[in-house]
Regions:
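Contiguous, non-catalytic segments that form substrate-binding/exosite surfaces or channel walls
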Residues: 125-213
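N-terminal leader/targeting and assembly helices and adjacent pre-domain segments
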Residues: 1-164, 286-417
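Acidic, glycine-rich two-metal-ion catalytic cores of nucleic acid-processing enzymes
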Residues: 184-288
């Protein structure tokens, strides 16, 4: 069994790597945008845009290759960690019932289950990540064409049009393309893949444990903030075979094995062995009712844990979007030869830095008032590049620049007043 709290945070380091890849790709796109130059002839402009798009496509593939090794290693690590943790948690229940303990490194069957899920998840993440090259190339062409139209109509100067293009590309972020045609943000896709993969791996291990021990009952985990369709079966005992009429059937009741059910897409519920007459239920009805109660107050209103979690995620997404814009502006400042464009981008960088400070202050206040934990792991990581522009590590350089830029912006505003 894997605890919901563990499943919420176990992939943070992997997602930090994904965020670093995203910001590196945005920086590459920004570099290409500021190098386009002012060409008024449409045919020449289109030729240059397509050439830049081709080079950017290669840039993205290079970035993916630089980070994929880190990501694959991290995927292997989290699966191994989760597998050991899962079986240790199960062992406590089995030993209490007089059953033998199964350890991951002593069970060939459990190791095969883990290895198969690691392989499947790595392939899914690698395939999805590669599609970012196509989506980024498309976003670049769209951004260039919009900038060209703005300049040609006389509505915007070249500098403002390019700065807008960088902003739009950064806000859109890196996206992946599923075979079905569905488009998602890269970090969302990776989180879904690794959470689902790890949880399903643990679930398969637990069912194998049940099979080997002869246990026929399981209890699902429960957590506050569960989606309504999952809240109806969380924290309850089920019969795996469906033969014990005292308990509802496991598969039919929880939807296990389907994307929308237990251990499906983005699900943080798991389950553990339960021995009637020996095991004590982990959750009382009072506890389950409390999980879905509107007991949290914020700005004079009552909210459930689920509602607060969605509010926090929304604020965190805005912070990441702002940091992507800062990355784009920063790359543009470093790579443009135009003093006027550099001035435009610098002004925007300072203004956006002040906005970032407000957003982070607002999120900290929200977490303080609602008793939630302020998550900063993902918002602090950025790629470190060597002299040739290759990703060789991670640091907080852009974040620190934003702090100083925010101070400069505040000073300017005070002078205006």
């Amino acid at each position: 069994m894997l605890e919901p709290e563990y499943l919420e945070k176990f992939s943070d380091q992997l997602l930090a790597l994904v965020d670093a890849l995203s910001t590196a790709i945005i920086a590459d796109m920004s570099k290409r945008l500021v190098k386009t130059g002012e060409i008024t002839e449409t045919s020449r402009r289109q030729a240059e845009i397509l050439q830049g798009a081709g080079l950017l496509y290669k840039d993205v593939l290079k970035r993916v290759s630089q980070v994929s090794g880190y990501m694959n290693t991290e995927v292997e690590r989290v699966f191994e960690e989760a597998g050991v943790r899962n079986l240790k948690n199960e062992a406590v229940i089995y030993k209490a019932a007089g059953e033998k303990e199964i350890k991951l490194h002593q069970s060939e069957t459990m190791q095969k289950i883990l290895a198969a899920n690691v392989r499947k998840t790595k392939e899914e993440i690698n395939n999805l990540t590669l599609t970012t090259a196509v989506k980024t190339q498309s976003a670049y062409i769209t951004a260039c064409n919009k900038a060209m139209m703005k300049v040609q109509t006389g509505a915007f100067s070249y500098d403002k049009a390019i700065a807008d293009a960088i902003k739009e590309a950064a806000v859109q972020g890196t996206e992946v393309l599923y075979p079905s045609g569905h488009v998602d943000k890269l970090d969302v896709a990776v989180r879904r893949a690794v959470l689902t993969g790890v949880n399903q791996s643990a679930a398969e291990m637990n069912l194998q444990y049940v099979k080997e021990s002869g246990c026929d009952h399981v209890e699902t985990t429960a957590h506050s903030g569960a989606r309504p369709t999952h809240a109806v079966w969380q924290g309850k005992v089920f019969c795996v075979s469906g033969k014990d009429s005292r308990y509802p059937p496991f598969y039919e009741s929880t939807g296990y094995g389907t994307g929308a059910g237990l251990c499906g897409w983005n699900c943080r519920h798991n389950f553990h062995a339960f021995f009637p007459g020996i095991s004590a239920p982990a959750y009382s009805q009072e506890m389950l009712d409390d999980y879905s109660a509107r007991k949290y107050e914020y700005n004079g209103k009552k909210y459930t844990e689920y509602e607060l979690s969605q509010m926090q995620r929304s604020q965190e997404r805005k912070i990441r979007a702002t940091k992507r814009k800062l990355t784009g502006y920063d790359a543009g400042i470093k790579n443009t030869d135009s003093n006027t464009l550099k001035a435009e981008l610098t002004n925007r960088f300072e203004s956006e830095s002040a906005e970032l400070k407000k957003q982070e202050k607002s999120l900290k206040k929200f977490c303080r008032q609602t008793g939630r934990r302020y998550e900063s792991a993902r918002t602090q990581v950025h790629a470190v590049l060597d002299s040739e522009g290759n990703i060789v590590g991670f640091n907080k350089s852009v974040a620190q620049k934003a702090v100083w830029a925010s101070k400069r912006h505040t000073s300017k505003m005070q002078m205006v007043k």
